[in-house]
């Protein structure tokens, strides 16, 4: 028979009393009522904040978006397949935030700032809220520095400034992403940090973009945020804000940043899916009523900081896909009204071999020549006017049989100007090279050449100028002005190269 020893029992009780922890832990918890399609309805969570992160029993994180009288609508940041009805959920007391640091440069991450490139963890000592307020009026200044894209058509006629928001819009397969990636490639050596946000893209397309950046050495100053088409809607909705938070981190450290959203219409579709599942009332095209606010609060974060804040900048280039050229659809009109201009890419131009397929007639930059160096303003002024007159004449010439000599000359000049705007993908040009190209075209030096010879001649001219007249580039880069000395050097180079070229073509 077991004997009970009172002293042993009292020792155990005494030990337990001594080890008793008096701390009272208050946890705001709730119970899962219903789960499915990336949405969970929770009973309880009485003091939860709008946008607060909540944690499910099995580890999935969600965001409380709908706060109703008897339940809370939560969107899941994962598939949530292990969440069960009746399981508990606890509020974390935190709003969605991500770690930020210099170590993110050169990495591919997801919307939660977790690396997805298989190169290990990223160290970060600081964090930023995913949804930060946009800079106020006093903390901004007007845009005055150019952000060179390396594309003649854009830098000469639709210039983009640091701190501007310029929409790239067009049908599918018209080279929208190519314009954006060329802009990133052109920032090499310009001290600009680039963030490329891929929302709902094919994983193969994102991999292709990353490979291009790696091959051209652009990943050194670029961060890629990717949520592909198979990602949960919540993460596709969050990805642009994550990219903006990373770009802001550098902007507030007095650096220049450029962020590309590819594309916000996919983010709007993900948000529509979440809203409809949360039973929010649908509006036009079944989008929720606050879809404008979805994009405006994102794009308003792009700014040129005032001198008090160090003059950092964040330039936003959202890309929106249209359906058969319809720019009057809901999302395109919303984004057009928020941005400071748009670059319109045309499928007809693309198919007729004009690439980049920029429709200069309906593309605008509301910042204009404030975002150009003086040298570019001096040579590019005539270009847009001559191209506009050419487009008008070309339409008229289709119906007229006999044209006078002046009209024929103007048409010939226009065709050569259109030819000089053509560029290969991933071959951005420096400002100096663009000035050479535009000056040669607008001053009639190409008129004597066949259209097929224009591209070849310009390539050779740029090479000749670089090797034989290096002082031309020095004058433009140091003074930012197209001086008389620079013009004389350029005229000399054109004449010398033209003689060489014509001899070469004859042989």
UniProtKB/Swiss-Prot annotation:
User: What CDD domains would the database entry show?
Assistant: ATP-synt_F1_alpha_C (cd18113), ATP-synt_F1_alpha_N (cd18116), F1-ATPase_alpha_CD (cd01132)
Specify the protein's topology with respect to the membrane: Peripheral membrane protein
Q: Where is this site: Required for activity?
A: 363
Residues crossing the lipid bilayer are none
Instruction: Tell me which InterPro entries the record gives.
Output: ATP_synth_asu-like_sf (IPR023366), ATP_synth_asu_C (IPR000793), ATP_synth_asu_C_sf (IPR038376), ATP_synth_F1_a_nt-bd_dom (IPR033732), ATP_synth_F1_asu (IPR005294), ATPase_a/bsu_AS (IPR020003), ATPase_F1/V1/A1_a/bsu_N (IPR004100), ATPase_F1/V1/A1_a/bsu_N_sf (IPR036121)
GO CC annotation: chloroplast thylakoid membrane; proton-transporting ATP synthase complex
Q: According to its UniProt record, where is this protein located?
A: Plastid, Chloroplast thylakoid membrane
| Keyword field contains Membrane | yes
Positions binding ATP in this chain are 170-177
Known EC number(s)?
A: 7.1.2.2
Q: Give the GO molecular function terms.
A: ADP binding; ATP binding; proton-transporting ATP synthase activity, rotational mechanism
Keyword annotations from UniProtKB, A to Z: ATP synthesis, ATP-binding, CF(1), Chloroplast, Hydrogen ion transport, Ion transport, Membrane, Nucleotide-binding, Plastid, Thylakoid, Translocase, Transport
PROSITE patterns under this entry? ATPASE_ALPHA_BETA (PS00152)
Q: What class of enzyme is it?
A: translocase
By sequence similarity, the record places it as follows: Belongs to the ATPase alpha/beta chains family.
What is the role of the protein in this entry? Produces ATP from ADP in the presence of a proton gradient across the membrane. The alpha chain is a regulatory subunit.
What is the protein name stated in its UniProt record?
ATP synthase subunit alpha, chloroplastic
Annotated source species: Platanus occidentalis
């Amino acid at each position: 028979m077991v004997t009970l020893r009172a002293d042993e029992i009292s020792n155990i009780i005494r030990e337990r009393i001594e080890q008793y922890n008096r701390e009272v832990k208050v946890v705001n918890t709730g119970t899962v009522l219903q789960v499915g399609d990336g949405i969970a309805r929770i009973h309880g969570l009485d003091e939860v904040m709008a946008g607060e992160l909540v944690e499910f029993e099995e580890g999935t994180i969600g965001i409380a978006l709908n706060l109703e009288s008897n339940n809370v609508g939560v969107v899941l940041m994962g598939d949530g397949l292990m969440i069960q009805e009746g399981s508990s959920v606890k509020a974390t007391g935190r709003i969605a935030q991500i770690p930020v640091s210099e170590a993110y440069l050169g990495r591919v991450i997801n919307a939660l700032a977790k690396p997805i490139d298989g190169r290990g963890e990223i160290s970060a000592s600081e964090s930023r809220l995913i949804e930060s307020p946009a800079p106020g009026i006093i903390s901004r200044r007007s845009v005055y520095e150019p952000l060179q894209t390396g594309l003649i058509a854009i830098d000469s006629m639709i210039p983009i400034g640091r701190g501007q928001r310029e929409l790239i819009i067009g049908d599918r397969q018209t080279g929208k992403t190519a314009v954006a990636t060329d802009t990133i490639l052109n920032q090499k050596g310009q001290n600009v940090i680039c963030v490329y946000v891929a929302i709902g893209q094919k994983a193969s397309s994102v991999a292709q973009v990353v490979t291009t950046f790696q091959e051209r050495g652009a990943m050194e100053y670029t961060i890629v945020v990717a949520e592909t088409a198979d990602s949960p809607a919540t993460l596709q909705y969050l990805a642009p804000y994550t990219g903006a938070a990373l770009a802001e981190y550098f902007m507030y450290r007095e650096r220049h940043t450029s962020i590309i959203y590819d594309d916000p219409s996919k983010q709007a579709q993900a948000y529509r899916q979440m809203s409809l599942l949360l039973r929010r009332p649908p509006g036009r095209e079944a989008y929720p009523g606050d879809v404008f606010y979805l994009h405006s609060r994102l794009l308003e974060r792009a700014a040129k900081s005032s001198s008090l804040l160090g003059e950092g900048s964040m330039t936003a280039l959202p890309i929106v896909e249209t359906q058969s050229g319809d720019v009057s659809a809901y999302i395109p009109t919303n984004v057009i009204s928020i941005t400071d201009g748009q670059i319109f890419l045309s499928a007809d131009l693309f198919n007729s071999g004009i690439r980049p397929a920029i429709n200069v007639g309906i593309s605008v930059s509301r910042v204009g020549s404030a975002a150009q160096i003086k040298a570019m303003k001096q040579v590019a002024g005539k270009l847009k006017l001559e191209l506009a007159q050419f487009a008008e004449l070309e339409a008229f010439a289709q119906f007229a049989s006999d044209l006078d000599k002046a009209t024929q000359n103007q048409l010939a000049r226009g065709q050569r100007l259109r030819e000089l705007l053509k560029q290969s993908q991933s071959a951005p040009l420096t400002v100096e090279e663009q000035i050479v190209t535009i000056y040669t075209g607008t001053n009639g030096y190409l008129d004597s050449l066949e259209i097929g010879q224009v591209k070849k001649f310009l390539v050779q001219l740029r090479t000749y100028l670089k090797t034989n007249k290096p002082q031309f580039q020095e004058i433009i880069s140091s003074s930012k002005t197209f001086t008389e000395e620079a013009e004389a050097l350029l005229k000399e180079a054109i004449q010398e190269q033209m003689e060489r070229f014509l001899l070469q073509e004859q042989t």
